[in-house]
Amino acid sequence: MSLTDPQTRYVNFYTDFAFKKLFGTEANKDLLLSFLNSCFEGTEHFLDITYLNTENLGVTATERRAVFDVYCETEKGEKILIEMQNGEQQFFKDRSIFYSTFPIREQAKQGKSWDYELKRVYTICFLNFTFDNDSDFTHTVKLVDMTTGKVFYDKLSYLYLEMPKYNTPLTEESSLYDKWLFAIKHLGDLDERPAELREAIFNRLFEQAEIAKYTPVERQDYEESLKNFRDWYSCLITAVRKGRAEGRAEGREEGRAEGRKEGRAEGRKEGRAEGRKEGRAEGRKEERLSIARNLKASGTLTISQIAMATNLTEDEVEKA
């Protein structure tokens, strides 16, 4: 994760301001259209997109509200959701599935005869964290028949991009898709546009991303967005490091105590092994609790956000 200095030449794509300016405004929809077509090259080609209201309400007043980063519609009426997620959340996959239900449900024709035919819905998620230690950085997800291994329903698609895993070298032979991913990941760290990004669309990208060309209001908005991004990241890293240290210390102590207890009852060898196993488990749990306590003390995140970041329940965070 880059923590770009606010005086660098180009904006940090991971900030809320930059992401929505470059991918979520009518003036820059050619940038998003180019990226989308690079994602689906060989399977789909979009001629135009129309931006839609990013705030969606449930069918009833009591249902939860969904706020998308970018929400648009193709010339065929297909819906596309684009999200930038900087922090790991316990139920992020669930949330992305939940969000995709809104474009589905809004297609229902109220008060009319309807045959249930649906337009395609695409969800694209940029992740500034990783799901696991697997080397694959991209995950294309559809409804699949587990018996045959074939796609059962192809109108609902999810593309998850684990950006920390993306380390493909940039060359002149790189695909447009790879060039876009490189630009998105490294934009805030660059002083010049790389020669490999020679396509005209990247001229547009770097023009729109150059901080010096912003109005005073835009520059202030960006710097505030960058500050929030840096504060959040710094707070999270500090809490994680402190929590890990405290968790390891408590885990070792509990492991030794449990090992001695089990050793007396069932023999030293088995007791030590069991003690180490339980101690590691307790240590990991205590590490998460310690991180939660540190995040609560910082006052920068809500209980719900802390729970998502630490894989704890909100009740556990409250009691931490």
Indicate where each model-derived feature is located:
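Elongated, amphipathic alpha-helical interaction scaffolds
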Residues: 1-320
